Curated annotation (Swiss-Prot):
Higher taxonomy: Bacteria, Pseudomonadati, Pseudomonadota, Gammaproteobacteria, Moraxellales
Keyword S-adenosyl-L-methionine belongs to the record: no
A GO CC term assigned to this protein in UniProt: cytosolic large ribosomal subunit
GO molecular function: structural constituent of ribosome
Gene: rpmI
Similarity comment: family membership: Belongs to the bacterial ribosomal protein bL35 family.
Keyword field: Ribonucleoprotein, Ribosomal protein
Source taxon at top rank: Bacteria
SUPFAM superfamilies: L35p-like (SSF143034)
Protein name as catalogued: Large ribosomal subunit protein bL35
GO BP, one annotated term: translation
UniProt KW Ribosomal protein keyword: yes
Pfam families in alphabetical order: Ribosomal_L35p
NCBIfam families: rpmI_bact (TIGR00001)
Length: 64
């Protein structure tokens, strides 16, 4: 059986942990002037990938 290829863009976006995959928050790159300080602060850090999306991430990144 042939080796599976990893989707490189996905490999850079997700990190495997013991409890699933973690990812960065969206909506934090640009157009920040109209967003409140509270909202920007809450977008800080990482969150876990939702359960319904874990299978997709596993298919895209079979070796991480």
């Amino acid at each position: 059986m042939a080796k599976l290829k990893t989707r490189r863009g996905a490999a850079k976006r997700f990190k495997a942990t013991a409890n699933g995959f973690k990812r960065k928050q969206a909506f934090k790159r640009h157009i920040l002037t109209k967003k409140s300080a509270k909202r920007i602060r809450q977008l800080r850090g990482c969150v876990m990938v939702h359960v319904s999306d874990v299978a997709s991430v596993r298919r895209m990144c079979p070796y991480i």
